[in-house]
Amino acid sequence: DNLDLLSTIASTSEPELLHGSTEDYLEIRDFMNNNDISIQNNYEIASQYYDVESLIEYKIAQIFVMNYDWPGNNNKLFKAKSSDGKWQHIMFDSDFGFERWTDLALGFIGSYETYNMLDHAYGGGNTFNNPVWSTAIFTAFLDNQEFKHQFINTYCDRINTTYSTDYTSYLIDSLKAVVAPYVADHINRYGPSLYDSYTPNTLAAYNGAVQRMYDFASYRPDNARNEMVELFDLNGATNTVSLFVNDSEAGHIKINTLNVNVQGWSGEYFSDIPISIKAVPEFGYEF
């Protein structure tokens, strides 16, 4: 009774009600479709309905992994029925991402390495997985400079940390270590019945699928940056920001969304987008 839960799928622009009411969602959708969100007052109104920080993180995650069976499909969102409740999205069914279904991708996007996923999520098209209505709210938010800068900097934060090649490769390593000992037995048990052109049914096919994930982890960060340069007409130049914390017990440094509490950290940011850096004292300390 305390939650609105909706789903949208490619066959219709109208949300499917799973729980609660669609009234609040339709209100903000219509507001954003009929008002210029580049105007700061309109943006602030929209931000009262949408959890902007959560929206940005969600969009970045879907775009980075290249889940192209989205946003027209596999899209759910919810809002608490409270005075401070705001719409947030639920990430699920992202198995099209990380170069998972290369054969199927050929019919939709051509190639993971060359397809512009940010543009896919921004402007909308005529395909089942990104009709214009499914990208309209995100597109409207990006008309606002404050939101656009926050999106760009947050994306850079993630590319510098959780979406970096080193970290995603580490995650692949850790998952492979768990799964690999059982792959041969799994294939021997189920054999050819596994094969549907996307599911490896030999050890060589399994190793090839894992290698594609490593390849994706290698090329995707640079491609993601290039997509931002293209869509937002950036000059493409980046600066390396290096941060040093002498005493982590006394405080840490916050850059955009990241809290840095190590002696040496560095990340790449676009030179034409301002970033936020501040020193944050721990309890009992001050700067």
Where do the protein language model's features map onto the residues?
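Middle-to-C-terminal accessory/interaction subdomains
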Residues: D1, E14-L17, S21-F244
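Surface-exposed interfaces of beta-sheet-rich extracellular modules
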Residues: I187, S276-F287
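Acidic, His- and aromatic-enriched active-site or binding-groove loops in soluble protein domains
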Residues: D1-T8
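Extracellular, modular beta-sheet/disulfide-rich ectodomains of secreted and cell-surface proteins
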Residues: L234-S271, E286
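Disulfide-stabilized cysteine-rich extracellular repeat microdomains
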Residues: D222, L258, P274, E282-G284
